[in-house]
Amino acid sequence: METNKQNNLLELFYQQYLKEKPNQIFLKSLKNLNNEFTWKETYLNILKLSQELNLFIENKDRCLLISENRPEWMITDLSIMLAKGITVPAYKTYVERDYEYLIDDCNPSIIIVSDHLQYNKIKNIIKSKPFIKKILSFEEIKDTTDVI
């Protein structure tokens, strides 16, 4: 893979996508071995999520990403880049006060969490932050209407 002709990771991914077989597995979860993404699925997921993000963010808006290492993390990171946002990655090991500091410091328009465990750490904080337009989650979070 030649890397000296691309300006960013998004371009690098796209150039490699054009070279690969669309139905070849590209990403695979370490926890759930049935959770895998082909090159084509990854590409289409990046496009779809970036279109959704464009409804809520403007150029250079920050998007807080709270997740463990998983295929959806990479898809989300590249989607944020495509939507012209800035990914602010956060460790999932942070506690509530760490997230509050980070949220106050970066003023994210969107927060993306991997699951209900991460959402529970921020749910009390986000109520007082009007700059947060939307909360997204990789997995379904029951008993809330705050998250899509």
Describe each region flagged by the PLM.
Residues N35-E36, E52-Y94:
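Conserved AMP-binding/adenylate-forming
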Residues N23-I25, P71, S109:
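Glycine-centered loop/turn positions within well-structured domains
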Residues I86-I148:
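Structural core segment of the AMP-binding/adenylate-forming
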Residues P22, L82, K129-P130:
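Short, well-ordered coil/turn elements that cap or connect secondary structure elements
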